[in-house]
């Protein structure tokens, strides 16, 4: 898994949805800085959290990794 791609893709999908990092963090049940820690390179989501992020965006994991979607 390309860590940079994951960070950039989360940011792309978040902006497309029109929500802030802290709004997304709270919606996923985490503290305010959770998504910022991921997008800034401080951490990566666990597999369970990755699935929750995909569900949040209403996409499948395959769609997450589809650069043309």
Segments the model singles out, each with a brief description of its role:
Residues 1-17:
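A short, Lys/Arg-rich alpha-helix, primarily the initiator
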Residues 16, 27, 56:
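Residues within the alpha-helical elements of helix-turn-helix
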Residues 22, 33, 62:
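Key DNA-contact positions within bacterial/archaeal DNA-binding proteins
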Residues 39, 49, 68:
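DNA major-groove recognition helix of helix-turn-helix
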Residues 48-63:
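DNA major-groove recognition helix of helix-turn-helix/homeodomain DNA-binding modules
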């Amino acid at each position: 898994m390309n860590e940079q791609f994951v960070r950039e893709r989360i940011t792309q999908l978040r902006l497309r949805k029109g929500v802030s990092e802290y709004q997304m963090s709270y919606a996923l049940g985490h503290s305010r800085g959770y998504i910022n820690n991921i997008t800034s390179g401080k951490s990566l989501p666990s597999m369970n959290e990755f699935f929750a992020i995909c569900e949040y965006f209403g996409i499948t994991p395959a769609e997450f990794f589809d650069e043309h979607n």
